[in-house]
Amino acid sequence: MKRQLLAFPVALMSLSASLAFAGGAPANQAPASYPVADSYLGEKLYPNEEAIAQGMASVIEATIRKQYQAGNARRDAHPKAHGCVKAEFKVDDKLADRFAKGVFIPGKTYPAWIRFSNGNPDPNKPDIEGNERGMSIKLLDVPGEKILESERQDTTQDFIMMSNPAFFLKDPSNAVAFFTALGSDSALAKAKIPFILGAHETATLLKINTKKISNPMQTRYWSPVPYQLGVGPNRMAIKFSARSCSTAQDPLPDHPGPNFLREAMVNTLKKGDVCMEFLIQPRTSDKLDVEDALDEWEESDAPFYKVATIRIPQQVFDTPEQQKFCENLSYTPWHALPEHKPLGGINRLRKVVYERISAVRHEMNQAERKEP
């Protein structure tokens, strides 16, 4: 178990503006306000939650500054990209009225950038090692004022997913202790991680950390944490998911190279377009917990509904220029319209962490931070 713990993924939570997850606001910018809990949708702030978020951001920032030299700072979570691809996100022509909110305008098509990634904090880990995988969608040309204070007028909307339907941290209560241990050079500190997490969270993390895939574009992804759909009295809590339009699966190669998942994407997109479906899962009962990120909403209790089709056209994406562009992109669930506000304690932490870490990364790399 100790060997596995050393390879634990720093999951989505570890980033704050892109956190794809670091402590205050960027220079020349006022500190962002901490999210207000929506009790109508089941949210509830944890004791000292904002201080936890700032502490977590500081721990992760220190790890980034220790791990990377200026000019080469990577994301703290999902630092290895299998590729960033151009895509189209087409909302279905016919949608139930209760789903036709925010970006889900029937028949609307958005250009998009999609980043497929590996969750291990070590960007040099070979792809064959089991791990969490990520799919982050950035829709472009999305009008309307956004939630994130520093980017209110930007025209993007992000959807962030991972290859497991449940997150490995239940709530903010043990986040600082976990990331402190994870960022430590001490094997003893890392050995304490199972005790910090508890049995259920450790089991979930080990499940995430041992999963292997053969092609990122044939893998299913979920938002393990919930989001709002709509505003006003008819707003609801949802989760979302993306999956291939086809059930075909590539076999794992007999002798995989260290970057075979990128190679699988290259080969797939040489042959033609890729189709994926985007689905939403409305919360159907108060028993489906908004604050517990370990709580998988079973499809038997809360079915998924398809709302859009993602088309990734045939393309060449593995160029140095596109890889640099991909590295400079920031993804955060708070790049969002109010109709898609992130919900739950883990998402609230991410607002602080993603914002700080993205700013730190771009500052260390002397790269301008802006949305495409």
Which residue stretches match the model-derived regions?
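Gram-negative bacterial Sec-dependent N-terminal signal peptides
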Residues: M1-F21
